């Protein structure tokens, strides 16, 4: 049997989306016409035909309603964070996660804990590696499940700065294209895992900079050039499963740390400010991000997390996630960092 073409695949994806939206909301709100047009212009949205725009409009209205209700509840003290509309407003949760969250935990994830903790060590109350120049600018992964690659290079960028004094954006595309061999288990835009990316860099003898191997948001043939090597990795360190104290110590004493989180909720997609604490967030991680610090805001402990969804996400690309809250969203479950 011949495999379905792109048109058939698009149809199979599109029809359930249309039906789902139609069942929930049959008619758009004409009082929002101006704001819809303004939002489209702001985020440069274009649709192939009126039918697609109608469906996207209904999804946008549903998300807008969620945002308005949440912020009303926030004003009444029911939440510790605010949400706001962004460029993902015309997408369903399933679409966003399918395109942008593709963390693939190895079936037999190593259980060996290599992080050495010093329980008597005094740690600072607040850490922000951005202030020490160890964090590059926020990236945008686009419609490619390369979250794991951006998380991995982010951790290595911090180590490179601490080791050499140079802050260099490393190539996520290098990992997308070249660490997809069977022995690593990564699938490029189809997902991957940070420690497998670190292992590739170790085996390969290095990784290029983004300047010489730029991000394309698609799977391409590996064309790594050792002459352009920008960083190396000697080994990687894994933290104890679910141990927030160990994560705090690692972030405070070692640098930015790669982690996995559950990022499957509207509250996460549209986060804007405050400390993200959603009771529906689970320990089933599906998205790779980078912890670059921690602190306390209005009496609530948080992890400072760098995402790879561009500056329109969250607080200029960052989110503060609840800390010391029963491993909220699984943030301390799969943590690692590289060493040079």
From Swiss-Prot:
* Tissue/organ expression: Widely expressed with highest expression found in non-skeletal tissues. Relatively high levels found in skeletal tissues. Expressed in spleen, B cells, dendritic cells and macrophages.
Q: Which EC number(s) does UniProt give?
A: 3.4.22.27
- Active site: residue positions: 147, 287, 307
Q: Which cysteines are joined by disulfide bonds?
A: 134-233, 144-189, 178-222, 281-329
Which UniProt keywords are present, listed alphabetically?
Answer: Cytoplasmic vesicle, Disulfide bond, Glycoprotein, Hydrolase, Lysosome, Protease, Secreted, Signal, Thiol protease, Zymogen
Which reaction is this enzyme known to catalyze?
Similar to cathepsin L, but with much less activity on Z-Phe-Arg-|-NHMec, and more activity on the Z-Val-Val-Arg-|-Xaa compound
Q: Which GO terms describe its biological process?
A: antigen processing and presentation of exogenous peptide antigen via MHC class II; basement membrane disassembly; positive regulation of cation channel activity; positive regulation of inflammatory response; proteolysis; proteolysis involved in protein catabolic process
Q: Where in the cell is it found?
A: Lysosome; Secreted; Cytoplasmic vesicle, Phagosome
Any single GO molecular-function term of the entry would be:
peptidase activity
**Leader sequence residues:** 1-17
Give residue ranges for the propeptide: 18-122
Per its UniProt entry, what is the enzyme's top EC class, as one word? hydrolase
Q: Which residues form a coiled coil?
A: none
Q: Which domain of life is it from?
A: Eukaryota
Where does this chain mainly localize? other
> One Gene Ontology cellular component annotation?
early endosome lumen
User: Which residues does the annotation flag as glycosylated?
Assistant: 120
| Family to which this protein belongs | Belongs to the peptidase C1 family.
Role this protein plays: Thiol protease. Key protease responsible for the removal of the invariant chain from MHC class II molecules and MHC class II antigen presentation. The bond-specificity of this proteinase is in part similar to the specificities of cathepsin L.
- Protein name, as recorded: Cathepsin S
Q: Which organism is it from?
A: Mus musculus (Mouse)
């Amino acid at each position: 049997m011949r495999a379905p073409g792109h048109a058939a695949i698009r149809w199979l994806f599109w029809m359930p989306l249309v039906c789902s939206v139609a069942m929930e909301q049959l008619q758009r709100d004409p009082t929002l016409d101006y704001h819809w047009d303004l939002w489209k212009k702001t985020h440069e949205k274009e649709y192939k035909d009126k039918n697609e725009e109608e469906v996207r409009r209904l999804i946008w209205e549903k998300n807008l309603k969620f945002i308005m209700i949440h912020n009303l509840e926030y004003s009444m003290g029911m939440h510790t964070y605010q949400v706001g509309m962004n460029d993902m407003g015309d997408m369903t949760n399933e679409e966003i996660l399918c395109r942008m969250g593709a963390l693939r935990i190895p079936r037999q994830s190593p259980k060996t804990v290599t992080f050495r903790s010093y329980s008597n060590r005094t740690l600072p109350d607040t850490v922000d590696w951005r202030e020490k120049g160890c964090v590059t600018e926020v990236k945008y992964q686009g419609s490619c499940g390369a979250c794991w690659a951006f998380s991995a290079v982010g951790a290595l960028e911090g180590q490179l700065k601490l080791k050499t004094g140079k802050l260099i954006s490393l190539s996520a595309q290098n990992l997308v294209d070249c660490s997809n061999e069977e022995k690593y288990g990564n699938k490029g835009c189809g997902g991957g895992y940070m420690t497998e990316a670190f292992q590739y860099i170790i085996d390969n003898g290095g990784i290029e900079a983004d300047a010489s191997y730029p991000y394309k948001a698609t799977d391409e043939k590996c064309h790594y050039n050792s002459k352009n090597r920008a960083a190396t990795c000697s080994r990687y360190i894994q933290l104890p499963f679910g141990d927030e104290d160990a994560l705090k110590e690692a972030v405070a004493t070692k640098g930015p740390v790669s982690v996995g989180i559950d990022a499957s909720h509207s509250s996460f997609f549209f986060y804007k400010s405050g400390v993200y604490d959603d009771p529906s967030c689970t320990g089933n991680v599906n998205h790779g991000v980078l912890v670059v610090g921690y602190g306390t805001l209005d009496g609530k402990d948080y992890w400072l997390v760098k995402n790879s969804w561009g500056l329109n996400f969250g607080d200029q690309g960052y989110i503060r996630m609840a800390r010391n809250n029963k491993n909220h969203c699984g943030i301390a479950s799969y943590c690692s960092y590289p060493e040079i």
